[in-house]
Amino acid sequence: MTHSQYIFGFHAITSRLRQHPDSIKEIYLDTNRHDQRARDLMSLAETTSTRLILCEQDRLCKMTGTTRHQGVAAHVTKLRRYATLEDLLEGLTEPALLLVLDGVKDPHNLGACLRVADAFGVHAVVVPKDRAVGLSATVHKVASGAVDTVPFFAVTNLARTLRELKEMGLWIVGTAADAPDTLDSVTLTRPLAWVLGAEDGGMRRLTREACDLLVSIPMSGSIESLNVSVSAGICLFETFRQHSQRTGSGLNVPAPKNAV
């Protein structure tokens, strides 16, 4: 099992430098980058005593497997902040909020879901080990640093994990277009895990059966379904909104800032 990987893109690498500089083995920067972003990255690398190597575009393409690396890549060790979900949940001082993704295969969707999870104070994102994308370099880039702030768990048996979460006191709520209950009709202030299905077929049968409740997202247009990251954003915002109304503040979310 490999414990290191390459990530790319200025947002992803800058976030890793600020959050976990010790996890970076070295940074590779396009020798032709002389702009402000490159200079800022070089300065931050120097401040954190991180090795930075100037190299050619071809080398960056081979490292990352893409031409869309923005001229920068980093060789990093994988982060591991909690041994188990149970460890994470036991340390919480507020109602747990998890995002469970069943079989999401598109790295852009997973990256966007992680970014949304960070925005609304999700305590962890959970995925199955098989038939789902992992934390690839593309996921790091799309997530814009959220990989470094949101704990991520890949589990062997998702349905069993959901049952274990129930035993730990979480309410398991899934989304389904045919669900009779709508998102805006449900109280979401208790500890819960949102479960969203894959881009093509939605939740698998055993995952769906493990849910305590299924809800649909009210829509008035002609499109029958939404991108999984859009659905995640809507569900998590409604959860955050209800927590804010109940307590005067949301979950563990930083002060509001302009969206990018």
Curated annotation (Swiss-Prot):
UniProt xrefs under SUPFAM superfamilies: alpha/beta knot (SSF75217), L30e-like (SSF55315)
Organism superkingdom: Bacteria
Binding annotation for S-adenosyl-L-methionine: G197, I217, L226
Keyword entries, A-Z: Cytoplasm, Methyltransferase, rRNA processing, S-adenosyl-L-methionine, Transferase
Keyword Cytoplasm tagged: yes
GO CC term, one of those recorded: cytosol
Chemical reaction(s) catalysed: guanosine(2251) in 23S rRNA + S-adenosyl-L-methionine = 2'-O-methylguanosine(2251) in 23S rRNA + S-adenosyl-L-homocysteine + H(+)
Primary location group: cytoplasm
Pfam families listed in its UniProt record: SpoU_methylase (PF00588), SpoU_sub_bind (PF08032)
EC number(s) from the headed UniProt entry: 2.1.1.185
GO molecular function, one term: rRNA (guanosine-2'-O-)-methyltransferase activity
Compartments, as annotated in UniProt: Cytoplasm
Keyword NADP set for record: no
InterPro entries named among the record's database cross-references: 23S_rRNA_MeTrfase_RlmB, Alpha/beta_knot_MTases, Ribosomal_eL30-like_sf, rRNA_MeTrfase_TrmH, SpoU_MeTrfase, SpoU_subst-bd, tRNA_m1G_MTases_N
NCBIfam families the UniProt entry points to: rRNA_methyl_3 (TIGR00186)
Similarity section: Belongs to the class IV-like SAM-binding methyltransferase superfamily. RNA methyltransferase TrmH family. RlmB subfamily.
PANTHER family: 23S RRNA (GUANOSINE-2'-O-)-METHYLTRANSFERASE RLMB (PTHR46429:SF1)
Function: Specifically methylates the ribose of guanosine 2251 in 23S rRNA.
Protein name listed in UniProt: 23S rRNA (guanosine-2'-O-)-methyltransferase RlmB
Gene that this sequence comes from: rlmB
